A protein has these predicted regions:
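N-terminal secretory signal peptides
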Residues: 1-13
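N-terminal export leaders
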Residues: 13-31
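C-terminal extensions of enzymes
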Residues: 28, 353-463
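C-terminal segment of N-terminal export signals and the immediately downstream linker at the start
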Residues: 31-68
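Metal- or metallocofactor-binding catalytic centers and their adjacent structured scaffolds
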Residues: 46, 50-55, 70, 82-146, ...
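Conserved, mostly hydrophobic/aromatic
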Residues: 89, 144, 245, 326, ...
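Shared catalytic-loop signature of beta/alpha-barrel
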Residues: 109-111, 118-119, 241, 252-267, ...
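Metal-dependent enolase-superfamily TIM-barrel catalytic cores that perform enediolate-based chemistry
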Residues: 152, 156-260, 264
């Protein structure tokens, strides 16, 4: 079990801890890690970027994720796959989730990259996810080494992975947990939301998986504060499957998060970087982190977490392409001890010719050149589509009902995460037993449109 912040073994006293924290704070503005420089003796002809091909895909969700994702994030089906060809003929590939990523790849950076040395460009933070992955893949293939060899020393031969789905009905959550376990996973991450019955979700899911299978829940602030959140969380401590609560309340509430850490048996995770990491370390506001972003971001954050002796899970999301990329970081980052969340389980296809195999909760870190997987060209042809100019956002309306007969309608009205935003504003009733939510099909009728127009975006419509 990972050490909680108050149990950091390398620090012998609170006084030593504070002294160390002072030094750490002084160094917070300095890079903790710098990217390596490949030998200049490598002929530029092997690493010069000759062309970059970009293809937009619409990769369908599986049935259960399709029902769940349709409410707030139907646009997650869109990815851009990039194939970088070097003068040597080597081709590297990568992907960007077009509407959920640390950065998309711009036309300008693609134009700039042509004729440049791939090894000199690959660490840049402005590349966008897909181009960065593709460059690393191409360079590693050219050197006949796995991507992880470009990142550092491999210290783990296997790395833990988590199954992911957004908030669902208790029945669908149990079905997903069961499927995850059948496919070798020992962790499942989902969302904790006041528009679903948390008690029914945990009860049904815990019945279909063994105690060693862990369930992590991301609240995205919806518990609102420690005073109200702690009594809710304590009601789930008897489940052996409960493992990590992510962002139970706003991360800016350092005192509240510190209180939750101290009072909960389960661990607390926060997104790295907000608030400033060394403040979180000092105030013991979490047990570990959620970590995503550029290659340099990941390496630097790992260095900081190593000093603090805190774990994290990698959260690099997309299809199997991004999951393959994540495996290499899982092999070299010492603090990547919690199961990585890649979300590739959502889709009907991994975009790889072979799946990522998980056994006993872990996947093997590839040792073949590049990413260690091959791109499925047939899948690219099958799922190819036009690139949307803006985030696709069809009008959607959800209906939430409670056992006492209350009904709530809320329309999307062009607002991203439109239900979550209302919950964070306190406009949705707090967590209750028996609550459930469904997407109201848009039948094109005047009645549907009338209700939709009344239901938001400023506040939900209660009937």
């Amino acid at each position: 079990m990972p050490l909680r912040p108050q149990e950091i073994g390398s620090i012998q006293s609170r006084r030593d801890f504070c002294k160390w924290m002072g030094l750490a704070t002084l160094s917070a503005s300095m890079p903790l890690w710098t990217p390596p420089v490949l030998a200049n003796s490598i002929s530029s002809k092997w690493l010069t970027i000759e062309s970059i091909e970009r293809v937009t895909l619409n990769v369908p969700f599986r049935d259960i994720p399709a029902r769940a994702m349709a409410k707030e994030v139907p646009h997650w089906v869109y990815s851009e796959v990039l194939q970088v060809k070097l003068k040597s003929g080597v081709i590297g590939f990568g992907e960007t989730m077009l509407f959920y990523t640390w950065k998309t790849t711009s036309d300008e950076v693609v134009k700039e990259a042509i004729g440049k040395n791939a090894a000199e460009m690959m660490w840049r933070d402005d590349l966008g996810a897909g181009l960065q992955i593709a460059l690393f893949d191409a360079v590693a293939k050219s050197l006949e080494v796995p991507v992880h060899a470009l990142l550092g020393t491999k210290i783990y031969n296997e790395t833990p992975l988590s199954w992911w789905n957004i908030d669902t009905s208790p029945e669908d959550m149990a079905a997903e947990c069961k499927l995850a376990h059948q496919q070798g996973y020992l962790a499942y991450k989902t969302k904790g939301r006041p528009w679903f019955d948390l008690w029914a979700q945990m009860e049904q899911a815990s019945k279909v998986v063994p105690p060693e299978f862990k369930i992590d829940m991301d609240f995205n602030d919806t518990l609102l504060d420690a005073e109200r959140g702690i009594p809710i969380l304590k009601q789930f401590e008897h489940y052996p499957q409960v493992d990590i609560w992510e962002t139970p309340i706003p991360q800016s509430d350092i005192a509240g998060n510190s209180r939750i850490v101290k009072e909960m048996k389960a661990k607390v995770a926060m997104h790295y970087g907000n608030p400033e990491p060394f403040t979180v370390f000092k105030e013991q506001a979490c047990d570990g982190f959620v970590l995503g972003g550029t290659a340099q971001t990941l390496m630097n954050a790992n260095a900081a977490c190593k000093i603090a002796d805190l774990p994290f899970w990698l959260q690099l999301t997309g299809t199997g392409i991004t999951a393959a990329w994540s495996l290499h970081f899982g092999g070299v980052l010492s603090q990547a001890k919690w199961p990585a969340v890649n979300c590739h389980q959502l889709y009907t296809h991994t975009l790889l010719t072979e799946p990522i195999v998980v056994k006993n909760g872990k996947a093997t870190v590839p040792d073949k050149p590049g990413l260690g997987f091959e791109l499925d060209q047939d899948a690219l042809a099958k799922f190819r589509t036009d690139k949307p100019s803006v985030r696709p956002d069809p009008p959607r309306m959800i209906e939430t009902t409670w056992p006492d007969g209350r009904r709530m309608l809320l329309g999307s009205h062009g607002v991203l995460n439109f239900i979550l935003k209302q919950a964070n504003l306190g406009n949705i009733p707090y967590f209750e037993h028996g609550v459930t939510t469904r997407l109201v099909p848009n039948d094109g009728s005047a009645q549907w449109k009338e209700l939709y127009d009344k239901a938001g975006p400023e506040k939900p419509l209660f009937l």
